[in-house]
């Protein structure tokens, strides 16, 4: 074998080795998704559609459940997940804390799927009567903003009440014991409290907040794997469309997963919104208003720019779809 022939053979062999290594790495790639007790991601997880779609790209899927949005985004911040869903407020607090996240997509408004609840025998009739009362909520969650806006509407501020910051399970226990006067919560915990405890709705989000669900990604993952992000959002959208058209089937499928009755599950399903899409300028502007509100209240340490953390789909990925 001549020197040139040997050189060409070695180059070809080296190229093949690199190619094989890249393929092996791609096959070992794992998309780590954080989800909560209820939502479109729960349905997507149970369907297996995402695993099937991403298998074509050599990507595996790993799912991790979190009790609420703030905890989920802490997982994203420390690198234990790549993608997840929360309400409007958690990403504001996470960004203020330095989390390297990107807003990827959102669901349409669902203002009825969060509310300020009262015990069935509570004498409280208006939000103004919460002055001086103990109100349970998950700090930095979507209902934190609902509470702020509801208090503003009633001429009060967060300093006029005693917030009791608890995750959903602990907040429900405190609510049942009578340790708090009100509980601000989202579905399916909201529907469960209404039907199991006969909790009364003092104020929901209608006419007050949008209550968008956001899908967020760790910036390094989204920038390295835009094609995975696009495929994921597409599967979320398809799952939402199917859910909207098949409420009975979804209820039967999800109730056992949640450990809730069909009646409670159906109430939550019907109040949820469906139709995931990439972030629009209008939604980014609304989210900026929320961030400014928490900054003005000194609940976050600095002003934020939401525009700086919006994921932009690369043209090459869009053209490939």
What are these regions, as identified by a protein language model?
Residues 51-58, 276-283, 306:
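Short, solvent-exposed loop/beta-turn-alpha elements that line the ligand-binding surface or hinge
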Residues 89-90, 163-164, 168-256:
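Pocket-lining segment of extracytoplasmic ligand-binding domains
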Residues 224-299:
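Secondary-structure end/capping motifs
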Residues 17-26:
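C-terminal segment of classical bacterial N-terminal signal peptides
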Residues 2-11:
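Twin-arginine (Tat) signal peptide motif
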Residues 29-157, 164-165, 181-185, 207-209:
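Short, glycine-/small- and polar/acidic-enriched structural segments
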Residues 292-321:
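Conserved C-terminal helix/tail region of periplasmic/extracytoplasmic solute-binding proteins
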Residues 40-41, 110-116, 199-200, 211-215, ...:
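Small-molecule pocket liners
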